[in-house]
Curated annotation (Swiss-Prot):
InterPro entries: FAM167, FAM167_domain. The keyword Signal does not apply. Keywords: Coiled coil. Residues 120-153 form a coiled coil. It comes from the Eukaryota. Residues 1-30, 56-108 are annotated as: Disordered. Belongs to the FAM167 (SEC) family. This is Protein FAM167A. It comes from Bos taurus (Bovine).
Amino acid sequence: MSVPQIQVEEVAGGEEGPAGTTPPPDDHLRSLKALTEKLRLETRRPSYLEWQARLEEQTWPFPRPAAEPRGSGEEEPSLLRTRALRPHPPPNGRANQDDGHPPTGKLEGFESIDEAIAWLRKELMEMRLQDQQLARQLMRLRSDIHKLKIEQTCDLHRRMLNDATYELEERDELSDLFCDAPLASSFSLSAPLKLIGVTKMNINSRRFSLC
């Protein structure tokens, strides 16, 4: 009997998994990928690079399918074969064998291919949900960082405006002290007198001390 093929894209299209969970309506993972491509971000962590190198150098025990199409009975999904190599918990429920359909094959930890496909679909759905949650957290973190930068910039500009306002007020106060228009150089007062607030209008009414 031919082995059924697994369509991963159909699983993410709104089909509920065994746990009854559905992917979120907003595709945060796609938004994160688009933002990553727009900003041209690349992962340069040593752990990720080492993992990528080991993955590329790893030799798979199963041969890859040829380029030309083969019959459905000879073609087996590579994702299922790769996933079957990983340790997985034994399934809780057993496949019903009394429905008249004998098991097509026996995998390690599974009674039938259908049971393995159901477990694989559940694992894929959980992985997609985790990816969506991580993408949503990263997008929210970027939004929070952007808001903090805006707040810091606004605070800096506010302090600059306050400093400029205080400086203008000081200049206005000083201009009030030296409001008289300058006459000829011979009739103008000296700079020290101006600093202590002496003008031509109040020089006769002010009292001075030599102490």
